[in-house]
UniProtKB/Swiss-Prot annotation:
Gene it is expressed from: glnA2
Co-factor remark: Binds 2 Mg(2+) ions per subunit.
Keyword list, A-Z: ATP-binding, Ligase, Magnesium, Metal-binding, Nucleotide-binding
Binding site for ATP: E182, H245, L246, S247, R322, R327
Gene Ontology BP terms: cellular response to polyamine macromolecule; glutamate metabolic process; glutamine biosynthetic process; polyamine catabolic process; putrescine catabolic process; response to starvation; response to toxic substance; spermidine catabolic process
Protein name: Gamma-glutamylpolyamine synthetase GlnA2
């Protein structure tokens, strides 16, 4: 055993931990778990735990279903809601084939593969997500309209703000697991919260996002609430995004920073943004993977909701412009390490492993191909007419999942990044979701048409 594995075994004994949950995600980003006893963990480190891959969305067909979950000891943490003895801990797993080779179906491996290519180019990829979600009073039944847990608004600090106690307990849990939080506050809509995680390497951040979602749901359950990461659960309120700040480092140097350049943004940073823009439409099915995702992007309320409700609809960048798809935040003098770009289209229901992989691939393509960055958007992009946007070369994002899938299907970049297995399954699964949605007769249609037609 190596030192990390020895630390895990020793901690289990010292803290009387009786269960270890081994976590991984399916292709769509749903968390999976298998529990093992501490006595089995040494063998799990050596050989992994076998399971039926055909039972996991997108993993394997029934006639080739044997797969192995091998725990990554660097991700070991004690679960804070099982802190009383005997306790429970968790580790994320890498998914392997029976011969020990990585499974191409594993979203974590998709990101690892992209990060390995990044490392070969001399870069380290860092991400920092701002995660929005709603707290609901109770679980809606049979598609009924949900009820927000409070009526507070952006940055509100009021006695009836249920979110304050919720966020305090949730952040305490996160930090006890080594997940650092930068900020938290009430967002713009009733019941809507935002918690921002501190910068970390992209793989750690993706693991942290998955942990974050479970912690939020666990704390909500304990408080008699429901936490949802659905992109847009309310027609009348802004949706929930996962705006993510990205940066590349070469060793200790921020590759996006250049003293004296416009916005202190280096050529590497400019080409990275150009890559994000050029490939934005074709990666949208990954960054915004649900039918409901496009209600957030094109829902209308985003444009008038004020603070916290600015979901981008058009492909452009801007300096400190929150109507743009990619924002270059204001540079803080003396803080060269803080140079970064913010991608604002991602929603809270995205699979973070696949999302970070395609964002990275798009940005690196811009660097490798020397893409030129178009002029930035200086105005409120939503306030422009279609003709004005066309004159500026500003194109729209896909308007629905069907459009996004058609663009993804033709994308060599997405196919290469996800790999054939994940790419094919993702398209099949999402086409089915789109067709099921298109065939529904909605409450809107019945309300508008049934009485008069």
């Amino acid at each position: 055993m190596d030192k990390q594995q020895e630390f895990v075994i020793r901690t289990l004994e010292e803290r009387d931990i009786r269960f270890v949950r081994l976590w991984f995600t399916d292709v769509l980003g749903f968390l999976k778990s298998v529990a093992v006893a501490p006595a089995e963990l040494e063998q799990a480190f050596d050989e992994g735990i076998g399971f039926d891959g055909s039972a996991i969305e997108g993993f394997a067909r029934v006639y080739e279903s044997d797969m192995i979950a091998k725990p990554d000891p660097s991700t070991f943490q004690v679960l804070p809601w099982r802190a009383e003895a005997p306790g429970t801990a968790r580790m994320f797993c890498d998914i392997l084939m029976p011969d020990g080779s990585p499974s191409f179906a594993d979203p974590r491996y998709v990101l690892k593969r992209a990060l390995a290519r990044t490392s070969d180019l001399g870069f380290t990829f860092y991400t920092h997500p701002e995660i929005e979600f709603f707290l609901l009073k109770d679980k809606p039944v049979d598609g009924s309209v949900p009820t927000p847990a409070d009526n507070s608004g952006y940055f509100d600090h009021t006695p009836q703000n249920i979110g304050m106690d919720f966020r305090r307990q949730a952040i305490t849990m996160l930090e006890s697991m080594g997940i650092s939080v930068e900020f938290s506050h009430h967002e713009g809509a009733p019941g809507q919260q935002e918690i921002d995680l501190r910068y970390a390497d992209a793989l750690s951040t993706a693991d942290n996002v998955m942990t974050f979602r479970l912690v939020m749901k666990q704390v909500a359950l304990e408080q008699g609430l429901q936490a949802t990461f659905m992109p847009k659960p309310f027609s009348e309120y802004p949706g929930s995004g996962m705006h993510t700040h990205l940066s590349l480092f070469e060793g200790d140097r921020n590759a996006f920073y250049e003293s004296g350049a416009e916005y202190q943004l280096s050529k590497v940073g400019r080409s990275f943004i150009a890559g994000l823009l050029r490939h934005a439409a074709e990666i949208s099915a990954v960054t915004n993977q649900w039918v409901n995702s496009y209600k957030r992007i094109w829902g209308g309320t985003e444009r008038t909701a004020g603070a916290g409700g600015e979901a981008p609809s058009y492909i452009c960048w801007g300096h400190n412009n929150r109507s743009a798809l990619v924002r270059v935040p204001m540079y803080k003098p003396g803080k060269t390490g803080s140079a970064r770009v913010e991608v604002r289209s991602i929603d809270s229901g995205a699979n973070p492993y696949l999302t970070y992989a395609v964002l990275l691939a798009a940005g690196l393509k811009g660097i490798e191909e020397g893409y030129e960055l178009p002029p930035g958007a200086e105005d409120d992009v939503w306030a422009l007419s279609d003709a004005e946007r066309r004159a500026l070369g500003i194109e729209p994002l896909p308007q629905n999942l069907g459009e996004a899938l058609a663009l993804m299907e033709r994308s060599d970049l997405v196919a290469e990044t996800l790999g054939e297995h994940v790419f094919d399954f993702f398209l099949r699964n999402k086409r089915q979701e789109w067709e099921e949605y298109r065939s529904q007769v909605t409450a809107f249609e019945l309300r508008k048409s049934l009485p008069v037609l």
